[in-house]
């Protein structure tokens, strides 16, 4: 028997997200595999990656009749800062306003469509707040490594594949993709305008940063994982016919960690990214763009982590020989030891 529905498909509503009202729309009412009816809620002006499914009958504190402004006035609630004049704040605190189209690849204008205008943050403001499911991945990862399990590499879903999947969700035309390396930031007084192309550029930049960080002095690797990394570099070099006894040739072999490692190691980098960025000479506008892109990517990872992470199935026990070699590994400087 169907539950009584207080809202209809196509109805404009106010939906509460992280304690604040946003204008939204009921786009559909679906039934899941358990026979539970769900409201499909789309936040107006946001990419569909933010869509939510709220069980019918459990929407009491989430969905309300009317607009966000009407809800705020009636309940004496604060409107989200994205609906007001931008203020200086941590961009990881709440989901950014997203003006992208819902269908990828439909943008036809010559100018990249703007995603959001956000206040400029300084290096001291930087913060990456991983959602609980992503934090749990890192906690479980630490526990498994401490029990002498190692992440299986190459991973089924590499960082390169994850970022490729993410980029596919960002609506840009083929013409715009060909200009992805052009100027992507527009300054408006104290604010910064972020385009869809800027999100793509930032995501690709994070991959490059990941490759440098993981491959430099064993950053992002626990000491127990270092022999695995060295073995993998040598294996890939031998496959290319490179002399592995030549340190210079091995270093220039073109090994890309992003082709081998998956979401766990990428999350390790994101969690420490503010500390890394403070060591750079980039100005506040560049840092601001990066952090907005990071947050948008985290939303994607949180929504899709079940595809890219399988828990303990992504790990394997180490052999006795491997364990002995890990104890003899050099003490390099690493973010995780």
Swiss-Prot record:
Keyword Transcription annotated: yes
Keywords in alphabetical order: Chromatin regulator, Chromosome, DNA damage, DNA repair, Meiosis, Nucleus, Transcription, Transcription regulation
Annotated GO biological process: chromosome attachment to the nuclear envelope; chromosome organization involved in meiotic cell cycle; DNA repair; embryo development ending in birth or egg hatching; germ cell development; heterochromatin formation; negative regulation of transcription by RNA polymerase II; positive regulation of transcription by RNA polymerase II
Domain MRG span(s) in chain numbering: 122-327
Any single Gene Ontology cellular-component annotation: autosome
Phenotype reported upon loss of the gene: Maternal-effect lethality and sterility. Primordial germ cells (PGCs) do not proliferate normally and death of germ cells may be as a result of necrosis or increased apoptosis. Increased proportion of oocytes with fragmented chromosomes as a result of irradiation. Tumorous germline phenotype that is suppressed on a rfp-1;glp-1 double mutant background. Germline progression from leptotene/zygotene to pachytene is defective.
Tissue expression profile of the protein: Expressed in oocytes (at protein level). Expressed mainly in germ cells, but also at lower levels in several somatic cell types, including intestinal cells.
InterPro entries registered for this protein in UniProt: Chromo-like_dom_sf, MRG, MRG_C_sf, MRG_dom, MSL3_chromo-like
Coiled coil: none
Region (Disordered) location: 75-113
Pfam families: MRG (PF05712), MSL3_chromo-like (PF22732)
Domain spans labelled Tudor-knot: 7-55
Role: Protein involved in the remodeling of chromatin thereby regulating various processes including transcription, chromosome synapsis and genome integrity. Mainly binds genomic loci carrying trimethylated histone H3 'Lys-36' (H3K36me3) or 'Lys-4' (H3K4me3), and acetylated histone H3 'Lys-9' (H3K9ac), 'Lys-27' (H3K27ac). During meiosis, required for the presynaptic pairing of homologous chromosomal regions outside of the pairing center and for the progression of chromosome synapsis. Essential maternal factor required in postembryonic germline development and in maintaining germ cell identity.
Quaternary structure annotation from Swiss-Prot or TrEMBL: Component of the SIN3S complex, which contains at least sin-3, hda-1, athp-1 and mrg-1. Interacts with cfp-1, a component of the SET2 complex. Interacts with rfp-1.
Protein name: Mortality factor related protein 1
Naturally occurring in which organism (per UniProt): Caenorhabditis elegans
